[in-house]
A protein has these predicted regions:
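Hydrophobic helical h-region of N-terminal Sec-dependent signal peptides
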Residues: 14-20
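N-terminal signal peptide c-region/cleavage motif recognized by signal peptidases
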Residues: 22-24
Length: 251
């Protein structure tokens, strides 16, 4: 980029022109560039989750296998994208030229009626806590995508997430989020036990880089994988076995 400056421009005008050039050039330098890959690409908001997708690609998995692995990993390590939430996905099929939409939204529990909430003193469902939650949609969405459009087993794609649940070095962003929200986390025993391992200390959440363990989540994922593997032992197809894992979670 070049800037034409009139010889009669004042010193102030030159400074303004220079500042304009600097800010514009900086914006161009810091703008996220297009990314390209020869064979595949794995992109998420968390580097470790992107690595999970890369591992699946390197093992011969397709884009859906990698996406499911990244989804599992992100839900394990990002507090605002958890296994208890919901998932939406768009899948482009190059063979048909069509886009498939996956809307894995959770159902409201059958007991979540207006009468139920009014009996507890609420005019509306609360904004936070167990009574605000729907049935988790993410586990079902992941299993459906993998069963219908993937090629690998649930055991393979959940391996990175399960490894993280055993313990990984937590990032500053997530750890600080726990600390900032600790007043609300203390309202629920299980949340307090998992996310605030240093109760009573000045900082009750994990420190950045501390090994963060989620043993209950690991147990849940293990039960799903065990259901899949048991179905495979009984001569079920890959797809049937994944749906058996989904049933293990919901039923």
């Amino acid at each position: 980029m070049s800037i034409m400056v009139n010889r009669k421009t004042t010193a102030g005008g030159l400074v303004a022109a220079a500042l304009l050039f600097s800010s514009t050039a900086l914006a161009q330098l810091t703008e996220k560039p297009p990314l390209h890959g020869n064979h595949w690409m794995a992109v998420t908001g968390k580097p470790l989750a992107a690595e999970a997708g890369a591992q699946i690609f390197q093992k011969g998995g397709n884009a859906i296998d990698a996406a499911c692995a990244m989804l599992g990993a992100v839900c394990t390590m990002w507090d605002v994208l958890s296994w208890g939430g919901e998932t939406q996905a768009l899948i482009y099929n190059p063979k048909t030229g069509k886009v498939i939409a996956i809307d894995a939204l959770g159902y409201a529990p059958t007991g979540a009626t207006p009468a139920f909430f009014k009996a507890k003193g609420y005019n509306f469902p609360p904004e936070y806590g167990p009574l605000a939650a729907v049935t988790p949609g993410t586990p079902g969405g992941l299993c459906y995508m993998l069963a219908e459009y993937g090629t690998m087993s649930l055991k393979e794609v959940l391996a990175p997430a399960m490894e993280m649940a055993r313990g990984y070095a937590i990032e500053a962003q997530t750890a600080n989020s726990f600390e900032a929200g600790k007043r609300r986390l203390k309202e629920w025993p299980y949340s307090k036990a998992i996310f605030l391992p240093h109760l009573g200390q000045k900082r009750e959440a994990p420190e950045a880089g501390e090994v963060f363990v989620q043993k209950d989540l690991l147990e849940t994922l293990t039960k799903m994988v065990e259901a899949e593997q048991d179905a495979l032992k009984h001569k079920k197809t890959r797809k049937e076995a994944i749906y058996a894992a989904m049933d293990r979670f919901y039923k």
